[in-house]
Curated annotation (Swiss-Prot):
GO biological process, one term: L-tryptophan biosynthetic process
HAMAP family xref list: IGPS_B
Gene giving rise to this polypeptide: trpC
Catalytic activity: 1-(2-carboxyphenylamino)-1-deoxy-D-ribulose 5-phosphate + H(+) = (1S,2R)-1-C-(indol-3-yl)glycerol 3-phosphate + CO2 + H2O
Organism: Ruminiclostridium cellulolyticum (strain ATCC 35319 / DSM 5812 / JCM 6584 / H10) (Clostridium cellulolyticum)
InterPro entries: Aldolase_TIM, Indole-3-glycerol_P_synth, Indole-3-glycerol_P_synth_dom, Indole-3-GlycerolPSynthase_CS, RibuloseP-bd_barrel
Statement: the UniProt record of this protein carries the keyword Lyase: yes
Protein name as annotated: Indole-3-glycerol phosphate synthase
SUPFAM superfamilies documented for this protein: Ribulose-phoshate binding barrel (SSF51366)
């Protein structure tokens, strides 16, 4: 399963990072930071309107190379200008060809919150996310049990970081809620088969209490998809490949937002 391969690769990456910069140092430096906009990401998805979280990614395991030239700073500017409420930046280097530098540069470029889209399997990565300027970290229920989710949310809370807790099925949604998640994202992509079906969000929406922000992720391509998710009361949609492949990310976002 590809998720297991990514997690194994990430574990090696984090262990190598710890040899370069110790866990105690990263934790200490992150803890010294003064977060001037704590929990900015969750405020963005709670504003009462359907929030568009727009993704910047160069490649993916399922689709290969998505953007060869990859003018990520221009894309970030276009997203913000077209009305994005937040930006998701892939930082996983092996399978998504991501980089922490992309997030640092995007954060300097835009005024909207930025999600670090990576595969969090170690507390080190949460402190690291704070240091590179992220407003939110991704926690994937398929990789983390309920107790670990609780632990990671507590660490993020102490840093003023939001957590987007991603689930794919009923049990994972329940785990996310039990862990105290304030933002639950339902991934419409089955990470075992890579099949995409937005009815997964529609089916699982009723399990998420109204005081928890609900984000639909993956496979959102059309005005009809947006309308369907708006009808079920989604707080936000996370859209990546549809925008990245469009040729004009800003215009495509404006088109989708106009349908909301």
């Amino acid at each position: 399963m590809i998720l297991d391969k990514i997690a194994a690769s990430t574990k090696i990456r984090v262990e190598n990072l710890k040899k370069e910069v110790s866990f105690s140092f990263v934790k200490s430096e992150a803890s010294k930071l003064v977060n001037k906009s704590p929990f900015a990401f969750e405020k963005a998805v709670k504003d009462g309107e359907l929030t568009f979280i727009c993704e910047i990614k160069k490649a993916s395991p399922s689709k290969g190379l998505i953007s060869e030239n990859f003018p990520y700073i221009d894309i970030a500017k276009d997203y913000e200008a077209a009305g994005a409420g937040a930006i998701s930046v892939l930082t996983e280097p092996e399978f998504f060809l991501g980089s922490d530098q992309y997030l640092k540069d995007v954060k300097k470029t835009v005024s909207i919150p930025v999600l670090r889209k990576d595969f969090t399997i170690d507390p080190y990565q949460i402190y690291e996310a704070a240091l590179i300027g992220a407003d939110c970290v991704l926690l994937i229920c398929a990789l983390l049990d309920t107790d670990t989710l609780k632990e990671y949310i507590k660490i993020a809370d102490g840093l003023g970081l939001s957590c987007l807790v991603e689930a794919h099925d009923e049990n994972e949604v329940k785990s996310a809620i039990e862990a105290g998640s304030r933002i639950v994202g339902v991934n419409n992509r089955n990470l075992k088969t890579f099949e995409v079906d937005i009815t997964n969000s529609i089916r699982l929406r009723e399990l998420v209490p109204s005081d928890i922000s609900f984000v639909s992720e993956s496979g959102i391509r059309t005005a009809q998809d947006i309308s369907a998710l708006r009808r079920i009361g989604a707080s936000a949609v996370l859209i990546g490949e549809t925008l990245m492949r469009s040729g004009d990310t800003g215009a495509e976002l404006a088109k989708l937002r106009g349908s909301a």
